Amino acid sequence: MRYKYCPECGIKLTDRQAGDDGLVPYCNECQMYWFNTFASCVIVMVVNEFQEIAMLHQSYISDEFETFVAGFMTPGETAEQAAVREVKEELGLEVEHLEYAGTHWFAKREQLMHAFIGYVKKRDFVLSTEVNDANWVTFEEAPKRMFPDRPGNTQHILYRQYTAHINGK
């Protein structure tokens, strides 16, 4: 989010030098800098003991491609807590082991994605109202259902990391 008006008093902000950060929106009334902000999100590739991957169809995201579990972090929540919560909310599954897979910038939506591989026991899904459908798919089938592999697509980054892991690299 790029601030144009002060969220506290509503006055139009002016650019002011803020040390090494350069010009930053500033409120002369409140005497506060308002640095640009962005959302922190999680994305989780959910994998079961048979190396099947949970693929979600969410029509508000795409009618053509499927995705992994993802969602916004809430204030006071760690990325790990958000990842476990999102898997429970969207699929009704308990994460047994969570493996951190780095952070990735999603420029299109100005979001910082905290990526994880979440290991679960294979169970039937209990879907959230946000999810139209979900399926366990084979490791080999998953990339065919994903969004195209382009810069910023965390799905493929996670998939490649998991591929390296199971191939012992």
PLM regions and their residue ranges:
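A generic fold-level signal
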Residues: 1, 39, 48, 108-111, ...
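Acidic, metal-coordinating catalytic segment for phosphate/diphosphate chemistry
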Residues: 1-43
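A short linear hydrophobic-aromatic micro-motif
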Residues: 15, 55, 98-102
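Short connector loops at helix/strand junctions that flank enzyme active sites
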Residues: 22, 37-41, 63, 68, ...
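Conserved Nudix-box catalytic region and its N-terminal flanking loop in Nudix hydrolases
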Residues: 47-89
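Unchanged
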Residues: 73-97, 102-154
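Charged phosphate-binding loop/patch that engages nucleotide di/tri-phosphates or the phosphate backbone
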Residues: 154-169
